[in-house]
Amino acid sequence: MAQEGGAVEQFGQWLWSNPIEQDPDDEMVDAREEEGQILYLDQQAGLRYSYSQSTTLKPTPPGQSNSAPVYRNAQRFQTEYLSPTTVTRSQVSVLSLSHTRPQLRPALSLLNSTPRANNQPWVATLIPSQSAGPPQRSSEPKRLTGRNSRNQR
């Protein structure tokens, strides 16, 4: 039984840490990555989130120069809530193909749509950063402000 719990924990760590893989033949068009955290000091709890989105252009197949472009859009949104008694993790990954170039989406819109307990109102405001190139890992979380949060740097 203890070994089964360890395997579940290892799978959870792998799932949390591995990014969505890109096709090496695709050309990077757009990318965005955002990270942040909120501390609820009165509850000794915290929420962290990570969001990445990338859009690539698939190469035109040989002999089909008149075909419409095909965009591959990959999105990954993760949240983790930690308190002395609770650990909750959530992850959503979306992969889509389209003939129109998708818009980059801010993480805040996803974070605001994440269900919360009645006693956990959303009071933080995200100050996002955008990247024009491929997603890069940031060692610093973005700054958040709000009544129940503390600025992080």
From Swiss-Prot:
It comes from the Viruses. GO terms for biological process: transport of virus in host, cell to cell. Residues 1-24, 121-153 are annotated as: Disordered. Residues 121-138 have a biased composition (Polar residues). Keywords: Transport, Viral movement protein. InterPro entries: Luteo_VPG (IPR001964). Belongs to the luteoviruses movement protein family. Transports viral genome to neighboring plant cells directly through plasmosdesmata, without any budding. The movement protein allows efficient cell to cell propagation, by bypassing the host cell wall barrier. This is Movement protein. It comes from Barley yellow dwarf virus (isolate P-PAV) (BYDV).
